[in-house]
Curated annotation (Swiss-Prot):
Compositionally biased tracts (Basic and acidic residues): 276-290
Originating gene: yidC2
HAMAP family reported in the protein's UniProt record: YidC_type2
Protein's recorded name: Membrane protein insertase YidC 2
Region feature (Disordered): 263-310
One cellular component (GO) term of this entry: plasma membrane
Keyword Ligase: no
Family: Belongs to the OXA1/ALB3/YidC family. Type 2 subfamily.
Bilayer-crossing regions: 34-54, 57-77, 136-156, 180-200, 220-240
Consequences of knocking out this gene: Doubling time increases for growth under nonstress conditions, unable to initiate growth at pH 5.0 and under 3.5% NaCl salt stress. Double deletions of yidC2 and SRP (signal recognition particle) components are barely able to grow in the absence of stress. E.coli yidC partially complements this disruption.
Stretches assigned to coiled coil: none
Amino acid sequence: MKKIYKRLLFSGLALSMLFFLSGCVQMKNGKPTGEGWVYKFFAAPMGSVIQYLANNLGLGFGFAIIIVTVIVRLLILPLGLSQVRKMTYQSEKMAYLKPVFDPIQERMKNAKTQEEKMAAQTELMQAQRHYGMSMFGGLGCLPLLIQMPFFSALYISTRYTKGIASASFLGIKLGSPNMIITVIIGILYLVQSWVSTLSVPEAQRQQTRNMMFMMPIMMVMISIGAPAGGALYWLVSGIFGLIQQLITNHIIKPKLRKQIDEEFKKNPPKPFKSNARKDITPQANNDKKLITSKKQKSNRNAGKQRHHKQ
């Protein structure tokens, strides 16, 4: 489940940043003004390449969009795979250390007092640091930040490059929304989500399948009102996402499992002893001593008062 949550978090963050970076392109009357760093340094050059392929080489805007998208996605594919590798390494290592973390999480869940909950949280953080685990499961931001200007520029250039709005591709008007491309995008991202569940343990697979419709629905909602030129970008990106997921399932993940097994065989995890519980016990003992001291003092004062009355 945590792995799926991280994937959804990653996808949601990517989409949010995409639209945020789209805001770096200044618009007027629904068209780019030519200002904004994303447009100047990324979208405009990509648009020029699209026009060159479409007009000078006679490939047409549809194939030009596909070619430029493929080239850019291939260039940033190593970054995407590096991101996936880090996330997968952390999740696989977490699965290996599940017997260590589960009891702590169970204590945190069943804590009856705020002190017990805080102690369990502290113990969990100490255990994560002890075993070299990241709280965010390897969800580093640098590869994502590097990729997002390219994603945003591709989307802008496929929507607003001059000539695309009036062009056609395989009988599809690139300047208007197209239901066929939208349906294909929905199916493609659904397959991608389904493939991602294949690497999940059988016990958790049913839960993950209930969540795998979120990304396809999100992509359909984005594509259904977008011009076909922009939707074509999402379609090609979906194909790359599926390829990346297959590489993860059949190459990266088995290799990392073998690597982690060898790491733990050579250097078995040392037993973790937390001092989080000890942080509360002395305080409790001090409180008891303070209460006892107050009672004894009160009893002595009461005895003196009785003696005085006598």
